[in-house]
Curated annotation (Swiss-Prot):
The keyword Repeat applies. This is Autophagy-related protein 18d. WD repeats lie at residues 31-69, 74-118, 203-243, 248-287. Induction: Down-regulated during senescence. It is a peripheral membrane protein. Keywords: Autophagy, Membrane, Protein transport, Repeat, Transport, Vacuole, WD repeat. Component of the PI(3,5)P2 regulatory complex at least composed of ATG18, SAC/FIG4, FAB1 and VAC14. Pfam families: PROPPIN. Residues 1-24 are annotated as: Disordered. It comes from Arabidopsis thaliana (Mouse-ear cress). The PI(3,5)P2 regulatory complex regulates both the synthesis and turnover of phosphatidylinositol 3,5-bisphosphate (PtdIns(3,5)P2). Required for autophagy. GO terms for biological process: autophagy; protein transport.
Length: 391
C-alpha cells in the first residue's frame, strides 16, 4: 500500500490540507493555556519544537528563547519535526480535539506560510524524520523513504511492530545511514544507502526501546525495554564497542544522546535521573571504508584509554569472569535529577553542557565536570509554555 502524495511545485491545492491562512499570526495571550502534546529536538540539538493542542512553537536553546509560534483554531500536532534551523517542518495531527488526521504528514514551509506537500497513509504515523535530502515516514510495521526534491519513493523497509516509531538518520551529506528495529526481537537494521549495504545488529535480548546515531551514522547506541544496559555499536560491521549500565532495576528509556565529539553519552529514563557516560571509541569515518569493504572491521576501534574521565566500575571488577557481569559494569560518570512525573529528553549543548526538555514544559541546562564527574550543576530552568518564559 503506497501512500498518496500531493505536490505541486508551481501551485497549491488546498483541498484536505492547510490553506495559506490556516495559521493565524502569533497571539501570545490566548495560547498560554495550550496543552503540551509533544517535544522534539532538531537534528543538531540547537532548537526544539513543541507540539501543542493549538499548534506548535519553536525554541532556541542557547540562549534559551521562544523563536516563534503558530496557532490554530482546529487543534494541534503530535509530531512536529524540524529540518535543522530551516523554515521547513513536518507536521502530523494529534492531541485534544485535533482536526488534522494522524495518518497524514504535512510538509509546511513557514517562510511561504503554506503546506507545500503531503503524504497520506492507511494507518497512524508513528514518527517522521527529516534530513536535507530525505523524508522518512515511520508506520508501525513499515518505513517509507522519499527523496526530498521530487518526493519520489526510494525505499520501503519492513520491520516488527514499532509503536514507538523508532528510527534515526545520519545527517552528514557524505553519509546516508538509517537505523530502525529489525524483524526480530532485539534486532536493529542499519541501512547504509550510500554503500548499498545492510547491517543487521543483534543488539539486545529484549525489544528495542530507544536508539540514536552519531551525525555521521558510524556509531549506534541502543537500549532495550529492560532499560538497564546501553550498548554502542560500529554500524559498519555490527561490532559492539562498549556497554554501560544505567542501573539494576528495569526502566523505560526515554532518550539516548551522543555528543558531537563522540566522547559522551547521555541517557534519560523514568527513574528521574539523567546519566552521562564517558565513551571509549574513536571514529575514523566512512571514507576509510572503501567500496571494496577493505576496512570494515576497523573503521571504528576502541581506544586503549578514554580522552576524558572514565566511568566508575565496580570495586569487584578484579573478579571479572568469576562473578556475574553486573560486577564489571561501567556506571555513569555524571548525573542530574529531574522529577519522576513525565518524560524528559536530553541532548548535548556547548562544551560540557546538556539540555533537557520535558513533557511538563520544563527546560533545563546543566553543566558537568569532564574530569571529576559527579552531580551536574543546574545553569537554567524555565517552564517554556508559561507566559514569563524568554521570548
Amino acid at each position: 500500500m503506497d501512500p498518496r502524495r500531493n505536490f505541486q511545485p508551481g501551485g497549491y491545492d488546498s483541498r484536505n490540507t492547510f490553506t495559506s491562512g490556516s495559521f493565524g499570526p502569533p497571539d501570545f495571550g490566548e495560547s498560554d493555556e495550550a496543552e503540551l502534546v509533544s517535544v522534539s529536538w532538531n537534528q543538531d540539538y540547537s532548537c526544539f519544537a513543541a507540539g501543542t493542542s493549538h499548534g506548535f512553537r519553536i525554541y532556541n536553546c542557547e540562549p534559551f528563547k521562544e523563536t516563534f509560534r503558530r496557532e490554530l483554531k482546529d487543534g494541534g500536532f503530535k509530531i512536529v519535526e524540524m529540518l535543522f534551523r530551516s523554515n521547513i517542518l513536518a507536521l502530523v495531527g494529534g492531541g485534544p480535539n485535533s482536526q488534522y488526521p494522524s495518518n497524514k504528514v504535512l510538509i509546511w514551509d513557514d517562510h511561504q506560510g503554506r503546506c507545500i506537500s503531503e503524504f497520506t497513509f492507511r494507518s497512524e504515523i508513528r514518527a517522521v524524520k527529516l534530513r536535507r535530502d530525505r523524508i522518512v515516514v515511520v508506520l508501525e510495521h513499515k518505513i517509507y523513504v522519499y527523496n526530498f526534491m521530487d518526493l519520489r519513493l526510494l525505499h520501503q523497509i519492513e520491520n516488527m511492530a514499532n509503536p514507538r516509531g523508532l528510527c534515526c538518520l545520519s545527517h552528514h551529506m557524505n553519509t546516508s545511514v538509517l537505523a530502525c528495529p529489525g524483524i526480530r526481537r532485539g534486532e536493529v537494521r542499519v541501512e547504509h544507502f550510500g554503500l548499498n549495504m545492510v547491517q543487521i545488529i543483534n543488539a539486545h535480548d529484549s525489544n528495542i526501546a530507544c536508539m540514536t546515531l552519531t551525525l555521521d551514522g558510524l556509531l549506534l547506541a541502543t537500549a532495550s525495554t529492560k532499560g538497564t544496559l546501553i550498548r554502542i555499536f560500529n554500524t559498519m560491521d555490527g561490532t559492539r564497542l562498549q556497554e554501560v549500565r544505567r542501573g539494576v532495576d528495569r526502566a523505560d528509556i526515554y532518550s539516548i544522546a551522543l555528543s558531537p565529539n563522540v566522547q559522551w553519552l547521555a541517557v534519560s529514563s523514568d527513574k528521574g535521573t539523567v546519566h552521562i557516560f564517558s565513551l571509549r571509541v574513536r571514529v575514523i569515518g566512512e571514507d576509510a571504508y572503501s567500496t571494496e569493504h577493505e576496512t570494515s572491521s576497523n573503521s571504528l576501534q576502541p581506544l586503549v584509554s578514554p580522552a576524558s574521565g572514565a566511568n566508575p566500575g565496580s570495586s569487584l571488577s578484579f573478579l571479572r569472569g568469576v562473578l556475574p557481569k553486573y560486577f564489571s559494569s561501567e556506571w555513569s560518570f555524571s548525573q542530574f535529577h529531574v522529577p519522576e512525573v513525565t518524560q524528559y529528553f536530553a541532548a548535548f549543548g556547548a562544551q560540557n553542557t546538556i539540555a533537557i526538555i520535558g513533557l511538563d514544559g520544563s527546560f533545563y541546562r546543566c553543566n558537568f565536570d569532564p574530569v571529576n564527574g559527579g552531580e551536574m550543576t543546574q545553569l537554567e530552568h524555565f517552564h517554556f509554555l508559561k507566559q514569563d518564559s524568554p521570548r
